[in-house]
Amino acid sequence: MARITPVSQYRNIGISAHIDAGKTTTTERILFYTGINHKIGEVHDGAATMDWMEQEQERGITITSAATTTFWSGMSKQFLPHRINIIDTPGHVDFTIEVERSMRVLDGAVMIYCAVGGVQPQSETVWRQVNKYNVPRIAFINKMDRMGANFFNVVKQMNERLGIDPVPIQIPINSEENFSGVIDLIRMKAIYWDDLDKGITFKYDNIPSDLTVLSDRWRQKLIESAVENDDFLMDKYLTGKKLSEYEIKNSLRQRVLNNEIVLITCGSAFKNKGVQALLDAIVEYLPSPMDVASYNVKKISQKSNSKKSCSSNMDLSNDQEAFVALAFKIATDPFVGNLTFFRVYSGKVSSGDVIYNSVKKKKERFGRIVQMHANKREEIKEVRAGDIAAAIGLKSVTTGDTLCDPNNVVVLEKMDFPDPVISIAVEPKTKIDQEKMSVALNRLAKEDPSFKVHTDRESNQTIISGMGELHLEIIVDRMRREFGVGANIGQPQVSYRETIQSSVKNVEGKYIKQSGGRGQYGHVVIDLFPLKPLNQSGYIFINDIKGGIIPGEYISAIDKGIQEQLLYGPLAGYSVVDIGVRLHFGSYHDVDSSEIAFKLAASLAFKSAFKKANPVLLEPIMKVEVETPEEYMGDVIGDLNRRRGMIEGMIDLSIGKSIRAQVPLSCMFGYATDVRSQTQGRASYSMEFLKYSEAPVHVASSIIQNRDKN
C-alpha cells in the first residue's frame, strides 16, 4: 500500500501543561475543528474524548496520556492536508511518567499556560522533560477570557522562570470579559472568530486603533528575532527593505527547530478563540519527522555480540529502510488485552510481520495493528516511518524496548524513569481477592514504570510504591474497578534511602560451613566508598582480583550477593544508594567453594563495611509551591516552617503570593486539608519530588527505632 501522506506533512506533537491550564479543553477544540468530533466534549461535564477513564471523568483531570490522529489544512485551507498525531499528557506531577515517555517519541510540543496562573510548578517540570529530549516547542497562552488574565505577564514569567526567549506571533485583543480575538503580528491583521458557529468561521480585520502602537512594538521584536541568526535577512532589515511573510515564517521556523526561541500564540479554548490559529502554527513551525532525524535518534548496531555506537543516520523519510520502532507505552484493554503503543522511526511494518525485540532479544509476530483515538481502536494493515500506533498481542515487550527488523538489529536510546517516593501496604480482603490482586498489580506495574510492587520480607505484606498519594489512590481505584479486587489499604509510608558518608578499607567477609560431607567456603575482602553527588541510583562494583586468588566464575556471585543487600539496607531496611564496592582480595577452597558460599561471604562483608562507613538515612524532599491570598501568607509560611520546610522565596501574583519551599515528604501528609483550613479554602498548592537529602539525626533515630519495633 502506497503512502498517503508524505512524511514532510506529519506533525507528531504532545500537548503539555500544568494542571488546570486548559490542556484537554484545547485538545477537544482541536478534535472539533479538524472534524474528528462533531460535538465538543467538555472536561467539566466529564465528556472530554481524551479523558476516557472513569477516574478522569470524575475528577476532571488527565491521568494517562491519550493518543489520537487528525488532519489539518489550515484556517483558510492554505496547506496540503497535514497529519497531526497528538498525545494529550497529564498535568498532575504524580503522573509525570506519562509526559516523560511521550516526549521521548514526539517531534514537537505545544506548551499551554494559563493567562492567570502563568508559569506554574508543573509547567517547569514539563519544560525540563521537553528540554531533556530536545523537543522543539511553541506555546499557547490560554484562558485569556478569565478574570486576572495577563498575556504579557505570562510572557515575562516564561523568560524569567524558564530562561527562554519567548517570541509572540500574536497578542490578544483586550482580555478578561472583553477578550475578542488576536492580532496576527506577521500579517498585522486582527482575527475575530464567530461565536455563533463555535469559532468555525473567522474574519481578518484592521487592528483596533488603540492597539496599533502596542502591535508595532511587538512586531518589531518578532522581526528582530527572525533576522537575528540570518545574515541575508539581517542585511535586508538593516537597509530598510521589507521582509516577506515567507522569509519571516521560514526564519522563525528554523529558530524553533534549533530550540533557540519559543513562539507564543494565545486565545481561549473554552470560548472557541485562538485554537484554529494554534493549529496553523503547529503546521507552520513545528518539525516533521524529517526535520529531527539528525538528533532525535541514537542508533546502536549489534554485531558479534558487541554493541557499537554510531551516529544517527536513519532516513526517516524513506519507507524502504529497515523497520525500527520504539515501544513507549503498554496499556491493558479489557477487550483485546495488552496494547503496545509504538513510534515508527524508519521503514514499515504490517500485521503478521515478524519483528525482533533487541532489548529482550526475542522475536515476536505483530498481530493486529490499530490506530488509537483515545480509547477507541481503528484497525489498520500497516504503519510507516513517522506513524504512532498500537499493536495487539505482543507478549514480551515493555516500555522502552526497541522493535526492529530481525535482519537489521539496532537498539534505540533507552528511556529513564523516576524511582517511587511513597508507598502503602495493600491487603486483599478474601482469598479470591488475593489471587486477583497479584494479576492486577503485575499488569498495572507493566503499564506504569514509575509504579513498583514488592513483598515486605518481614511483615510479608504487599507494598505498592508510586510518585505520590494521588498516583497510588488511582492505582487502588483501578484495581477495584477494572479487576474487581477488594483490598484494605494502609497508611502512606515514605520511601527512605540509605547511604554512607565515609570510605572503609579491607573489610573481610568469610562464610565457612563444615558439617560432614562437602562443606562451604567463601572468603572476600572489600573496600566500600560513597559515590558523589547523591543521585539515589548509583552502584559500582570494581573487580580488582589479581592472580586468580578468587576464580572468575565466583565474581558475579559476589556482585550479586552485594546487590541483594542493597535492596534492604542494614540501617533500617531501606534500599541502599550511591555506593561503590572494590573487591581486591579473598581466598577459595578447591572442593568446598561454591557460588552460594561466595554470595553469602560478600553479603557479610558488605553489612560489616556499611556499618563502619558512617551510614545515614536519606529522606525525599519535595518542591512545594503554595498560592495564597496575601492576608494568609504568614499562616502558610509558619505552617511550612513547622513542617521542617525551607522557604526559598515568594512571587507576587494577581491573586496574592506564591510561596516556594522545600519540605520533607514525611511532613506533607494531610497538607491539603490543613492549608484549606488555614486559608478558608482560598489557597492551592502543588508538590513534586526534588531530591533526597540526609535526614536530621533525631528524625533518622525515630525512623530506625520504629522499624526495629516492627
From Swiss-Prot:
Keyword GTP-binding on entry: yes
Q: Which CDD domains match?
A: EF-G, EFG_III, EFG_mtEFG1_IV, EFG_mtEFG_C, EFG_mtEFG_II
Q: What is its main location?
A: cytoplasm
Location(s) in or outside the cell: Cytoplasm
Matching PROSITE patterns: G_TR_1, G_TR_2
The record's annotation in InterPro entries points to: EFG_II, EFG_III, EFG_III/V, EFG_IV, EFG_V, EFG_V-like, EFTu-like_2, G_TR_CS
Q: Where does GTP bind?
A: 17-24, 88-92, 142-145
What superkingdom does the record give? Bacteria
Q: Which GO terms describe its biological process?
A: ribosome disassembly
| MF-aspect GO terms | GTP binding; GTPase activity; guanosine tetraphosphate binding; translation elongation factor activity
Q: Which Gene3D superfamilies does this one have?
A: 3.30.230.10, 3.30.70.240, Elongation Factor G (Translational Gtpase), domain 3, P-loop containing nucleotide triphosphate hydrolases, Translation factors
A GO cellular-component term linked to this record:
cytoplasm
Quote the SMART domains the UniProt record gives: EFG_C, EFG_IV
Which keywords are on file for this protein?
Cytoplasm, Elongation factor, GTP-binding, Nucleotide-binding, Protein biosynthesis
Q: Where is the tr-type G domain?
A: 8-290
What HAMAP family does the record point to? EF_G_EF_2_B (MF_00054_B)
Family per UniProt?
Belongs to the TRAFAC class translation factor GTPase superfamily. Classic translation factor GTPase family. EF-G/EF-2 subfamily.
Briefly state the protein's biological role.
Answer: Catalyzes the GTP-dependent ribosomal translocation step during translation elongation. During this step, the ribosome changes from the pre-translocational (PRE) to the post-translocational (POST) state as the newly formed A-site-bound peptidyl-tRNA and P-site-bound deacylated tRNA move to the P and E sites, respectively. Catalyzes the coordinated movement of the two tRNA molecules, the mRNA and conformational changes in the ribosome.
Protein name (database record): Elongation factor G
Instruction: Please give the organism.
Output: Buchnera aphidicola subsp. Baizongia pistaciae (strain Bp)
